[in-house]
A protein has these predicted regions:
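Cofactor-/ligand-binding subdomain signature composed of acidic, glycine-rich
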Residues: 233
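Short Fe-S-cluster ligation motifs
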Residues: 327-340, 354-380
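Small-residue-enriched alpha-helical segments and adjacent helix-cap loops
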Residues: 2-5, 21-162, 167, 171-175, ...
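An acidic, glycine-/histidine-flanked metal-binding catalytic module
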Residues: 152-226, 261, 362-366, 380
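Intrinsically disordered, low-complexity polar/charged tails and linkers
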Residues: 1-18, 224-230
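Short flexible/disordered coil segments
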Residues: 119-126, 190-201, 320-322, 353-365
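Intrinsic-disorder/low-complexity linker and hinge segments
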Residues: 89-90, 217-224, 272, 372-373
Length: 380
């Protein structure tokens, strides 16, 4: 079996444990419940200008990442973020706080997320990418986003806890959510879900192992809501960003409009907005062609990248039909879109490989394509 041409880290960067990339340190800030107050958002923008290169990424886990931070400025950045209430006491605490919360949260959802956050210290030692999903808004919106332990609602509104990969969930009372999450995490470890520090709930469930007793699944979650798109919603204005990246100036402008809910869809919800903001660089409509493509940072921003990809992806976006997806990856790791796409282009040492209906790690249909001459016409 061939060795992969990329390195799998097995952990996610944080603020206290940043990751070195091609443009400096990547410092990931994990807002509580995915929400930034206006003061916090303005502070993050200022910190990105002062300590980084002024670019801010939205991660697939609803976090914000400051790019281009130097090792010399990291300590000062942490001090600024700590003053904003965005930093945990220790890196181990930060690593545990892998909690994705629906941006359409009500008071009950925010309270559940707070209880879960307080319970993380009672969790067993879990793999670095083990995550919790709080999807208890008016309707589930994270059906296509992986987690490990999920809080959802039944069709009648009752609260549920579900293992990723399981069809049915267990009913749980509001005041028992944190205890149930701890118990389910303990069961995951005891049932053999962790091997050499790694493991995911879906893999364990896929082996036919399932919890028993009060955590046994017996109720189906409510049907998922339609996919979120840019535009006005009941809670405010959803705005998107090409490749999930904005400038510090854009973040500062958004902060002036209202509190921000960071989503895993490369979008931000501006709470309470009743009109779409008139700011440069925002995606405001569902039919924008840039929403039909996914691309990672590419070279030179990523150390593992074999080529620049974003300019190429932006050029090709106009040729992607509505309802189709093009994924352009700078290596076979496929960070921007781990799953299959209608077309995937993967950078190699000799050009780009093309994969139809697969992921970046699948066998190519065409190899060594020149980025200057790639033409998507007739391929979809």
């Amino acid at each position: 079996m061939m060795e992969p041409s990329f390195q799998v880290q097995g952990w996610c960067p944080g603020a206290l444990r940043p990751m070195m990339s091609g443009d400096g340190l990547v410092v990931r800030v994990r807002p509580q419940a995915g929400r930034l107050t206006q003061t916090q958002a303005a502070g993050v923008a200022a910190a990105a200008r002062t300590h980084g290169n002024g670019l801010i990424d939205l991660s697939a886990r609803g976090n914000v990442q400051l790019r281009g931070v130097s090792t010399a400025s990291h300590s000062a950045l942490i001090a600024d973020l700590r003053a904003l209430g965005l930093i945990d006491a220790y890196a181990t605490d930060e690593a545990r706080r892998n909690v994705l919360v629906t941006p359409f949260a009500d008071a009950a959802t925010d309270a559940l997320a707070a209880r879960l956050g307080a319970a993380l210290a009672r969790m067993p030692q879990l793999p670095g990418k083990f995550g919790f999903v709080v999807d208890t808004g008016p309707a589930p919106v994270f059906a296509g986003i992986a987690g490990d332990i999920r809080f959802e609602r039944a069709a009648g509104g009752g609260l549920l806890i579900r293992c990723e990969g399981a069809t049915l969930a267990a009913p749980v009372a509001e005041d028992e959510t944190s205890d149930a999450a701890v118990e389910l995490a303990q069961w995951f470890v005891a049932a053999g879900g962790v091997t050499e520090g790694r493991g995911r709930m879906a893999a364990l469930i896929g082996r036919g192992v399932a919890p028993e007793g009060r955590l046994a699944g017996s109720v189906a979650p409510a049907s998922a809501a339609p996919a979120a798109v840019p535009g006005l919603v009941a809670e405010g204005a959803l705005v998107g960003f090409a490749f999930g990246q904005m400038t510090a100036d854009t973040m500062a402008a958004l902060a002036a409009l209202g509190p921000l809910r960071i989503t895993p869809w490369r979008m931000v919800l501006i709470e309470g907005m009743r009109a779409l903001p008139d700011l440069p660089g925002l995606i405001l409509t569902a039919d924008d062609p840039i929403r039909r493509v996914e691309a990672c940072s590419g070279a030179p921003a990523c150390l593992q990248a074999l080529a620049p990809v974003r300019a190429l992806t932006a050029r090709l976006a106009r040729d992607v039909p509505a309802g189709k997806l093009l994924h352009v990856s700078a290596c076979a790791k496929g960070c921007a879109h781990p799953g299959p796409a209608d077309l995937t282009l993967v950078a190699t040492a000799t050009g780009f490989d093309l994969i139809r209906g697969g992921s970046a790690q699948d066998t190519p249909d065409q190899r060594a394509l020149s980025p200057e001459t790639i033409d998507l016409k007739g391929l979809f």
